[in-house]
Amino acid sequence: PNGCGKSTLLKSLTRLIAPVSGVTLLDGKSLHSQPTKQVARQVGLLPQGPVAPDGIRVIDLVSRGRYPHQSLLRPWSPEDERAVSAAMDATGVRELSGRFVDELSGGQRQRVWMAVALAQNTPILLLDEPTTYLDVRHQLELLELCRELNLRDGYTLVAVLHDLNQAARYADNIIALKEGEVVAVGPPADVITESLVREVFGVEARVITDPESGSPLMIPRWGSGVTAGVGT
């Protein structure tokens, strides 16, 4: 649910904030003791509500995803060009390359930011509500892309999703949080249960098996413990 610590958790996994207690490890070493560029070559982040610099074009923003791989001794290279090109193709934003980011729709911007994360070409990718602003088609395309990155290319992906049915369909494992605490961890069938939906979200629901995917499918029981308001 909202405010349970999902975004805070992702930020702590990318050095944006330091944990108050405990330690975050990357390859067995403290994440916060490693050089920033070294971490950025291993872990990519699509944050919630990113803001692009004024007057920047799509191609230039996506190219910034290659910054962790560059240095004085290694300027822009054909490898960078290939990574940017592949990221734009994968997210369907190549036709937007010459446009200014601030003139795009919310859904187009979200796909551009996904391209930035992909151009970074990290083995670990953290996505904070990646389907925000996207219509149903582009939501499914993005989630299918994530699945492909995992199965074909070996990426490790961690995504914050509010749609339980999408999470159940695409995730190998789900972590349910409530008020900053981990409530459940495991495969979708073990986590997406009627009792957990009631405990975490305060929603009475029926959970059945999706006949298409075989994953759990949550169907809210409106009128049974939930009050739905309609604005006027």
Task: Please tell me what each predicted stretch does.
Residues 63, 78-96:
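Conserved ABC ATPase "signature" region
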